[in-house]
UniProtKB/Swiss-Prot annotation:
Main function: Antimicrobial peptide.
Taxonomic superkingdom: Eukaryota
Propeptide segment residues: 1-18
Protein name (database record): Brevinin-1PLa
InterPro entries tied to this protein: Antimicrobial_frog_1 (IPR012520)
One of the record's GO cellular component terms: extracellular region
Locations listed in the record: Secreted
Tissue: Expressed by the skin glands.
Family: Belongs to the frog skin active peptide (FSAP) family. Brevinin subfamily.
Signal peptide: none
Pfam family, one: Antimicrobial_1
Keyword terms: Amphibian defense peptide, Antibiotic, Antimicrobial, Cleavage on pair of basic residues, Disulfide bond, Secreted
């Protein structure tokens, strides 16, 4: 399936997993972590 084929791009796969994982499993803590990561990495 499509998700299996995307494993050719490891960096992107991690990002995709995080995008699915944080909103579903930990939406509020996930948003807090995103803001912290954003502030630290300055990628926003």
């Amino acid at each position: 399936n499509a998700e299996e084929e995307r494993r050719d791009e490891p960096d992107e796969t991690d990002v995709e997993v995080e995008k699915r994982f944080f909103p579903n499993v930990a939406s509020v803590p996930g948003q807090v972590l995103k803001k912290i990561f954003c502030a630290i990495s300055k990628k926003c």
